[in-house]
């Protein structure tokens, strides 16, 4: 299966670990999503790809960030740690791009490993993500698993919720994002 999801990457994770590789890089067939594998064979975490890349970008240039609502607070925490603003957008690349333009964000993306870096173009681009991640890793001079430990550790459960007309969706979202 070409989807860069943990359940589809068990073989490369094993190869990465067995061969003492420094890390593994996996992209999907149209190269708009990126997954990283730590030297120990564990997944870096597709959401944390954007977090790490944003950390690097924000360390060099202050600015806003955007990710979709299917995210943990990790990007928000890293962004606010630099004294910058984070915004969330509806799921979908077009929604993230619209919010990035509206907030003048310098980095954003979807938590499926889709990095959007408007300095180059407004589209998810795994190769841009690879370049930014590798630069960040080289400057930090640490193993991929050690870099991952520097970010807030959140767990997200992506469950479908049935909505009825009586439910105030705006209030639910406001409550979720400002707890």
Residue ranges: model-predicted function:
Residues 1-140, 153, 177:
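Phosphate-binding chemistry for phosphorylated carbohydrates and sugar-nucleotides
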Residues 141-179:
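Catalytic-core signal marking the mid-to-C-terminal active-site face
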């Amino acid at each position: 299966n070409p989807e860069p999801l943990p359940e589809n990457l068990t073989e490369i994770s094993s190869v990465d670990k067995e061969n003492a590789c420094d890390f593994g890089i996996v992209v999907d067939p149209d190269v708009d999503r990126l997954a990283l594998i730590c030297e120990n064979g564990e997944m870096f975490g597709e959401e944390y790809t954007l977090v790490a890349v944003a950390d690097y970008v924000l360390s060099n240039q202050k600015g806003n960030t955007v990710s979709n609502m299917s995210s943990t607070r990790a990007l928000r925490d890293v962004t606010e740690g630099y004294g910058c603003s984070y915004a969330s957008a509806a799921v979908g690349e077009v929604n993230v791009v619209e919010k990035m333009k509206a907030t003048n964000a310098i980095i954003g993306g979807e938590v499926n490993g889709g990095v959007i870096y408007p300095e180059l173009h407004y589209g998810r681009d795994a190769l841009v993500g690879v370049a930014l991640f590798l630069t960040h890793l080289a400057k930090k001079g640490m193993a991929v698993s050690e870099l991952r430990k520097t970010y807030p550790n959140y767990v997200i459960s992506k469950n479908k919720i049935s909505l009825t007309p009586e439910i105030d969706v705006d209030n639910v979202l406001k409550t979720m994002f400002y707890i």
